[in-house]
Amino acid sequence: MGAGKTTFYEAYLKEAFPTLVPAVREQQQPFLNDRRSFAVEDIRVDTQLLDEAKAAGYSTKVLFISTEDANLNVGRVLVRMSRGGQAAPASSVIDSYRESTKNLSEVRRHADDLIVYDNTAHDRGYRVVAHFTGGELGKAAQTIPDWAAKVFGKELHSAKQRGKPGRT
């Protein structure tokens, strides 16, 4: 909550994926069964869904968005609420922030592509931090935010040492 997932979807994905399926497995299954493309917005990536989708012939791409601090997300949610948007208690926003990165390192082994974005500087837009393809790091930003370093730290640091960072 407050990282910018819905804003990203509205700006960049809605045209290609007009159906945003809730993160409820029962509502996702018909899309898998009918082999229809869809997008899911959730705070935690369902690796089982990724595996099922790949087994059904889908190409899977995870776009993960976070910020440096849960309190930044709380502030954004408060602004959204003041404008009539969806309400959420600060404790829920903080819990969601913590929960969101718990399985992120594992996700890269389940998704065909994992693109990690930092949206801390709201006025500068989304910044690609890392791009994993087939579980392997393809590119990493020159500057890694602390939250991403905690998740992928050694791997991103090693990539820089090998001269693998790209223009992201």
Where are the regions a protein language model picked out?
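Conserved nucleotide-binding/hydrolysis micro-motifs of P-loop NTPases
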Residues: 3, 45, 66-72, 121-123
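Short, well-ordered alpha-helix to beta-strand connector turns
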Residues: 13, 35, 111-112
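A contiguous binding-surface segment within folded domains or other stable secondary-structure elements
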Residues: 53-83
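Glycine-rich phosphate-binding P-loop
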Residues: 1-12
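Amphipathic alpha-helical transducer elements in NTP-driven molecular machines
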Residues: 21-25, 47, 70-71, 87-90, ...
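Conserved GTP-binding G-domain of TRAFAC-class P-loop NTPases and closely related GTPase folds
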Residues: 79-166
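Glycine-rich phosphate-binding loop used to anchor ATP phosphates in small-molecule kinases
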Residues: 19-65, 100
